[in-house]
Regions:
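Short, acidic/small-residue loops that bind anionic groups at enzyme active sites
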Residues: 115-129
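Structural beta-alpha unit
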Residues: 62-94
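Charged helix-capping and loop-helix junction motifs
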Residues: 48-53, 84, 108-113
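Short, structured coil segments at secondary-structure junctions
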Residues: 27, 63, 112, 119-121
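Short secondary-structure boundary segments
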Residues: 35-36, 93, 97-99, 128-129
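Small/aliphatic-rich secondary-structure junction motif
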Residues: 1-52, 59-68
Length: 129
């Protein structure tokens, strides 16, 4: 079993890492950090390089969790990528970070986050910075 953590280098991504590592440790399973840049997106903004991926794996070790970083590209539907990873790695949950929003913003959840919450094949844990 694994816990999948959807990660982009941002405060929301760091919140997802913290919550995901805590869940993986509590369940005594490994963590799979999925950094999935959109095909054609500005990769320097969202894609981790090898040293950043190694730093995340070290952060997991310090949290008492075994982790691996995967970087599958996706076209338009991130949830399909996460569901495929969840199936391939026997995931028990997906963890994502959400931006804090105003009252109106809460009504209109981010489109990727909403898709993940509605279409995920496994339970989703959300967290904020």
């Amino acid at each position: 079993m694994t816990v999948i953590i959807g990660y982009l280098p941002s405060p929301e991504g760091q919140a997802a890492l913290k919550a995901g590592f805590a869940e993986a440790k509590a369940r005594d399973v490994r963590a799979l950090v999925v950094n999935s840049p959109r095909l054609g997106a500005a990769s320097e903004v969202t894609t981790l390089d090898a040293s950043e991926a190694a730093a995340l794996e070290e952060q997991a070790r310090k949290a008492g969790v075994e982790a691996e970083v995967l970087q599958p590209e996706h076209e338009d539907n991130l949830v399909e990528t996460l569901n495929r990873c969840a199936k391939e790695h026997d995931a028990s949950m997906i963890v994502i970070g959400l931006r804090k929003r105003s009252a109106i913003g809460k009504f209109i959840l981010g489109s990727q986050a909403q898709r993940i919450l509605l279409d995920s094949d496994v339970p989703v844990l959300t967290t904020t910075p």
